[in-house]
Amino acid sequence: MTFRPWQEGDDLELLQIWPDAESTSAATFRASFAPDSDESPWRRTLVAEHKGVAIAAATVYETSLHTEHLWAYVEVAPDHRRGGIGTELLERLRRLAQDSPSGVVSLRSKVDVESDAVEFALAQGFKKIQRTRVVRLEAGSVPGVLLHQNDEGEMTQAIEDIATGSVELTQKVWDFYQRSHQWDPPAQTSLGRVNRLFLSDEAEAFGALVLRDDVLSARANGKKGDIKAFAVSYRPLEHDMPGFEVEDDAATEVLLGYDFDYPQAREAILQMLSPLAAQYPVTVEVTESMKDLSILIDQLIKMGAASVVENSFVVVD
């Protein structure tokens, strides 16, 4: 067995012996394999060869949004697993991490709950810090929840379209992201960069809805009601691939967020979900830290209105 740095063409060679990616996370990690870089983001990638044929790869890299850990990923061809190759690659990544520019050496990864990777990660000293699920909601499956109105029948809430370039929306997205990632706090960053990461054309965002509350009082003061929940829709990256055809039952990926301090957060979530999934299926990512959303998703799963399409753990060493 020989080990060497990643070089151009390794991805094509590995795809000849690797099966399809087991999850979206695995596909994303595969896309992160690249030659070593000392620029931002710093990266080191290794390849394991057996008799001159690439059979495994591993990478470790920094990110500017989450700086307390380095991302790490190891994948070995199924026919060569349980032979110590993954362990050797991980040990080499740990040694390479000693030279990261930030000085951070702790590793973080994401593993599918049903995969052998969980057992491997725990055996290598990693521990689970969060569970993440991608959940599919079928068209028309979410019960409708009426918007509030006052005694005169005037609406005190409103759902409206909002530009993805909105500073107000960007701030709400960032507030939600920080509150839902206290288990792995993001670094402080500008709203401009937040917009680029989550709401830009580059991020494949193509539309957004918001739920506003107390709109009558706000309007009387020349303002709009405060945003209590939001939903951002994304185009799948595969849309840019030549010959890609959208399946009839394809679901739209949605980032669903809400005000953690809003007493009626669960109701607000349903008020957003119902119109979103009225005619077409959607997928939503939910973590254990999103307690109100997680509880509602569990209820929808029990009702048969939702199903888990991906279930993974974030692990750190």
Pin down the residues of each PLM region.
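C-terminal "cap" of GNAT-fold acetyltransferases
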Residues: 135-168, 296-317
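Extended, charged low-complexity segments
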Residues: 214-216, 235-317
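Short amphipathic alpha-helix that is part of the acyltransferase structural core
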Residues: 1-33, 145-189
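Conserved active-site alpha-helix within GNAT-family acetyltransferase domains
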Residues: 87, 99-105, 109-131, 289-307
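Conserved acetyl-CoA-binding loop-helix of GNAT-fold acetyltransferases
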Residues: 76, 82-95, 123, 261-279
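Active-site rim helix/loop that mediates acceptor-substrate recognition in acyltransferases
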Residues: 11-59, 184-221
